[in-house]
């Protein structure tokens, strides 16, 4: 059973049935309507039935974990994820929670350090016994925690677009994998810009290196085009003048940039200072969302293209309500990027899956995940595939001076996720 996201929807058939079935409880009928529904749900789903493996579930609460970097070089990217997850939890609680239980969260800081992520994941699963974790950003952090989630049988909702080549019973990947972003984006830029030469850049860790490996294979083997250069920089790097000079000399049709976190601020400022006009030099990024532009400054990246599945400027009712709620909770000046939106999907998809499973038990939630759909997604609509990735649209945006993106392209239909594309292993 899946549920649409309607705030305060007390009149759904499911809830009407509950209300009718518990109308005889005269004491409960004195409660406010939302509390009445919550109590009725909790009684229909007793703790002993919905939590059989010792998770942090009581008759009135269920505890989840939030695990992101709020310090270090990745804080610029991950803070939005934390804010989105807290907003989703607040909205879910306002609707009565999950199976009649309010969501409580325990937040840990991965501190932009992969061993710290693994240590905190173990704490959340073993000590706190959380029913799920919303967390990680970089692939390095996800790779660090994955053995922990598999060993202790936890459930991670991972929000970042990533390189693919992974699938786990213990992870729901709410961002895009390579075929939905890297390959689709390269096809668009080649076709639209008649591009023949590319220069690949990235931060020096697993996601950019693997993504550029996939990009190079696609450029050379499928599109039959040329890569003029490929360079990597340690996380937190601020010196890009040398590679900028090389690119100015080699004149690639497309700069393909997968630099992450705070390094983006230095890179785009130095690019502009070197006289590179992104309205004339095509640059495509798959790592700069509105969150990063907030630090970069719109004037330093205007004209660049980004291939994502979500932009804050998307014009649909779900997104307007989401942006409004986000600004109300976190301030009008906050911006919302692709990963922030994908992080917002995590608590909602978990809630819907728990309700479909009728249980918080990890194995039952994992088994119930395929086919769960969230019609209230700000990006429009998403559905969980059998491979635990999401069906979603691919979009291309162009950076504006105000730090937002203009939507310039989107796929007509949802793209099926394929984390293991043939020929790209």
List each model region and its residues.
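Extracellular/periplasmic bilobed ligand-binding domains
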Residues: 212-307
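Solvent-exposed, acidic/polar segments of extracytosolic/periplasmic ligand-binding ectodomains
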Residues: 45-48, 373-425
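Hydrophobic alpha-helical segments within soluble ligand-binding/sensing domains
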Residues: 49-50, 117, 174-198, 209-210, ...
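N-terminal secretory signal peptides
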Residues: 1-17, 21-41
């Amino acid at each position: 059973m899946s549920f649409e996201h309607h705030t305060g929807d007390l009149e759904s058939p499911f809830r009407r049935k509950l209300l009718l079935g518990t109308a005889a409880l005269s004491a409960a009928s004195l409660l406010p309507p939302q509390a009445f529904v919550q109590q009725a749900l909790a009684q229909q789903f007793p703790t002993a039935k919905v939590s059989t493996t010792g998770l942090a579930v009581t008759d009135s609460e269920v505890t989840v974990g939030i695990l992101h970097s709020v310090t270090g070089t990745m804080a610029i990217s991950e803070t939005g994820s934390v804010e989105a997850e807290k907003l989703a939890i607040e909205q879910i609680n306002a609707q009565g929670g999950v199976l009649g239980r309010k969501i409580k969260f325990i937040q840990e800081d991965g501190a932009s350090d992969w061993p710290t992520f693994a240590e905190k994941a173990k704490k959340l699963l073993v000590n706190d016994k959380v029913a799920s974790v919303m967390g990680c950003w970089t692939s390095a952090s996800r790779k660090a925690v994955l053995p922990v989630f598999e060993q202790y049988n936890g459930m991670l909702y991972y929000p970042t677009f990533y390189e693919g080549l992974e699938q786990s019973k213990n992870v729901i990947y709410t961002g895009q994998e390579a075929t939905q972003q890297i390959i689709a984006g390269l096809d668009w830029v080649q076709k639209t810009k008649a591009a023949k030469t590319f220069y690949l850049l990235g931060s020096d860790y697993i996601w950019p290196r693997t993504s550029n490996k996939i990009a190079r294979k696609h450029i050379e083997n499928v599109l039959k085009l040329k890569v003029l250069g490929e360079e990597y920089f340690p996380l937190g790097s601020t010196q890009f003048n040398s590679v900028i000079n090389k690119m100015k000399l080699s004149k690639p049709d497309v700069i393909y940039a997968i630099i992450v976190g705070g390094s983006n601020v230095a890179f785009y400022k130095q690019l502009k200072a070197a006289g590179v006009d992104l309205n004339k030099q095509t640059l495509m990024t798959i790592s700069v969302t509105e969150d990063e532009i907030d630090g970069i400054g719109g004037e330093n990246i205007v004209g660049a293209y980004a291939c994502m599945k979500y932009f804050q400027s998307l014009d649909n009712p779900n997104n307007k309500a989401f942006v409004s709620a986000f600004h109300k909770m976190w301030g009008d000046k906050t911006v919302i990027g692709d990963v922030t939106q994908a992080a917002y999907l995590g608590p909602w998809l978990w809630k819907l899956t728990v309700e479909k499973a009728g249980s918080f038990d990890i194995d039952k939630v994992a088994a119930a995940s395929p086919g769960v759909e969230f019609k209230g997604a700000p990006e429009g609509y998403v559905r969980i595939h059998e491979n635990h990735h999401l069906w979603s649209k691919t979009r291309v945006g162009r950076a504006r001076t105000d730090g937002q993106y203009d939507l310039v392209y989107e796929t007509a239909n949802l793209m099926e996720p394929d984390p293991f594309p043939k020929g790209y292993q």
